[in-house]
Every structure is written in C-alpha cells, then in structure tokens.
A protein has these predicted regions:
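Juxtamembrane/disordered regions of integral membrane proteins
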Residues: 1-154
Length: 154
C-alpha cells in the first residue's frame, strides 16, 4: 500500500471521528457559536452539504496526503506523536488562514475566547487518530519495495 493511500485512509478515519465530535458537540449545545460547518457556509454561497464535502476533502485528501508526505521527513515510528504534532500544524493553518477568511478573526477571536482552545482540542483528536491509523496501516500493509528492472526474473 502506498504512503498516499495510507494517508488518505487514515485521513478518512480521522475525519469521520472529528465529524462525530462536531455532531456530538452540536447536539449537546456546546460552544454553539463555534460551528465549523456554518463557518464554511459563511465563506461563500454554498449549502451545508457542500460545506461537509469541503470538510471531508480537506481532512481526507489535503491533510491525509500532507501527513503521508511529512512521514518520510521524520524517521520516528511514534505515529501517535507525529499525529499530534501534525494536528497542531493543521490547527495553526486553520487559525491563521481559515478563521480570518471566515471573518472570525485570527485564532477565532471574534467567536470567543474558547474558540482557539476548542479547535485545538479537536485538531489534537484528529491528529492522534490520523497518526495511530496511519501507523497501523504501515504495520499491516508495508509499502512494496520497487522492483529492480535490472534483476533477472527466474
């Protein structure tokens, strides 16, 4: 299994877990002012379904592929730790790129003081799941060594 596929599969599982946390948070009425899907909808004239699709594209494709690419830069097999660090990276990108675009201010300051902490917690969950699942996929489905075309076949 390729690193890219492992990254996207791990990203899918992590995004599903994060989506469950978002739905649970909304159903419990916690931090209702911090609704990431509503923030995505506010960026343009897109519907809620399209915002969820964007959420999955970023979580599965963008972050999944970036995690797979960054995996080779750090030779540790502590995938859970790589995931947590990557979660902080993804959170920082959200705080300095997405939040200002959504008119929520740097680090979500216009939403309220809890915005930065709550989203950090959610990104740490995402990163932890991403790293653990990627590590499990790496253990169970190691990358195939490329064939050497100069080696004669028997």
């Amino acid at each position: 299994m390729s690193n890219s596929l492992r990254g996207m599969l791990a990203g899918l599982i992590a995004t599903l877990v994060l989506s469950g946390v978002l739905i649970l948070k909304a159903n419990m009425g916690l931090w209702s002012e911090l609704n990431l899907i509503r923030l995505l909808v506010s960026l343009g004239s897109i519907q809620t379904v399209a915002a969820w699709m964007d959420h999955f594209i970023v979580g599965v494709v963008v972050w999944g592929l970036l995690f797979a690419a960054f995996d080779s830069l750090w030779e540790s097999r502590a995938y859970w730790l790589k995931g947590l660090i990557f979660g902080v990276f993804a959170w920082l990108m959200m705080m300095v790129l997405f939040m200002p675009l959504a008119k929520a201010g740097w680090f979500g300051t216009r939403i309220g003081p809890a915005a930065a902490y709550v989203t950090l917690g959610m990104h740490l969950i995402y990163g932890l799941v991403l790293g653990v699942v990627y590590g499990l996929l790496t253990a169970y489905y190691p990358a195939k060594a490329p064939e050497n075309p100069s080696t004669p076949r028997g």
